[in-house]
Amino acid sequence: MTIRSSMKNNAELESKSVLANESNIISTFTRRIIKEKSGNYQVLKRSLDGKLIYPEATGISSNRGNKLLQRSEVVTRRDLNNSKPMIEQTVFYNGSEHRLLQTNIVTDSRRKRIKFTPDINVEPVLVGDENDIDGSEKEDENITDEYYGEEDDDDLSKLVNVKEILTPILSLGDIINHKTISRTFSSPILKNLALQIILMIEKEQMSVVRYSQFLEVFLGDHPEPIYESNLNLPSYNHNLTLPEDRGASDEDDINNKNNINEVNSNSLSTEAGHINNGMEEFGEEDPFFALPRLEQSNALLSLLPSSSGSASISTLTAAEQQQLNEEIESARQLSQIALQRNKEFIRNLQKIRKSVIKANRIRGRILNWSREYLGISDDDITIPVALRVVKRGLISATTNKTTNFEEEIENTMEDGVVDDNEPDEEANRA
């Protein structure tokens, strides 16, 4: 009995140890998986079957037609020309990599810390053992100050001047003197946007040309340019040589005619049937009034797959021919819809560009008015006093400024009269 009981105890202990080991293995495996999957990565964009992973959207100018690419949502209205590669900074912690959502700007290897100004009237109330906590916090502050160097903390109320931002405009001079407003009116962002929009319009116009050529293939036209050699026109003597020069150029004409006859014999051999039919119908046709004889383009047949090419179309069954015709019709409809959408997109871009240019023109006029109001000369151009007074009067008439403007006009007019009289006195003396 003792042997059997000891064997049972050993078996139970071994089973417990095995279960413990299995539970440890499972727990470590789950922790490992959780650590590897805990990174805040975005889900990759894949195809419907999940086999194809779309590439990254690097070097694209717009997300039109590129929305399936990775990180295509980063392309914003503010930065249309996104030619820079989108490389994200990552940090490794907790067993996996994480994307950095925000980076702190470090200057002179020192870290700036922001503290909120506490209310002076409110005194802190200590409860329990908060004295020890304050002591430990002071020690931590000393450690951080020693580590980051002796630098004063930045006060949040001093970093942002709310009063300066929310102060209304009293005159046109505030557009130049007010820092926040002058930064807005002197920014070239509207000009850059207009330039980027016109570049996008040119790019979309090229795609419109390609779609148009593709539709011409479905209509049976020639998508490529048509040259004189493809028109199959009969030979015609234009009589461009003078009678005096004919004798000197007879030998050259004979040689050229021989070469031309050789070329025409090769090219017109395949067209003899068409020409004979035309001659039978219309009789003798003047080569000067002859119409070009163009054959139907074979560009559509070249686009078909090899199994259903021009040589084997006749061997297809009725079901295969019907399926092929449906595919051709669907491709034509889709290309026509794409062409219409592309033209509509170009029209919308043109409207947007007109609005942006108009806003930029108004911004420039307001900025120039404010410069003239303050008497700031552009490019060393001096404005006469009388003209300056008239302009300031017109500008002030359209604004709400009512402060001692008449006195300023009188003073400037007196100065202007004195300045204008000086040259006359010198002229009288002379």
From Swiss-Prot:
Similarity section: Belongs to the RXT2 family.
Summary of subunit composition and partner proteins: Component of the RPD3C(L) complex composed of at least ASH1, CTI6, DEP1, PHO23, RPD3, RXT2, RXT3, SAP30, SDS3, SIN3, UME1 and UME6.
Compartments where located: Nucleus
Keyword presence, Isomerase: no
PANTHER family linked: TRANSCRIPTIONAL REGULATORY PROTEIN RXT2
GO cellular component: cytosol; nucleus; Rpd3L complex; Rpd3L-Expanded complex
Disulfide bonds: none
Positions of region (Disordered): 408-430
Keyword DNA-binding among record annotations: no
Protein function: Component of the RPD3C(L) histone deacetylase complex (HDAC) responsible for the deacetylation of lysine residues on the N-terminal part of the core histones (H2A, H2B, H3 and H4). Histone deacetylation gives a tag for epigenetic repression and plays an important role in transcriptional regulation, cell cycle progression and developmental events.
GO BP: any one term: invasive growth in response to glucose limitation
Protein name, UniProt field: Transcriptional regulatory protein RXT2
InterPro entries: Rxt2, RXT2_N
Additional record remark: Present with 1630 molecules/cell in log phase SD medium.
Originating species: Saccharomyces cerevisiae (strain ATCC 204508 / S288c) (Baker's yeast)
Record keywords, A-Z: Chromatin regulator, Nucleus, Repressor, Transcription, Transcription regulation
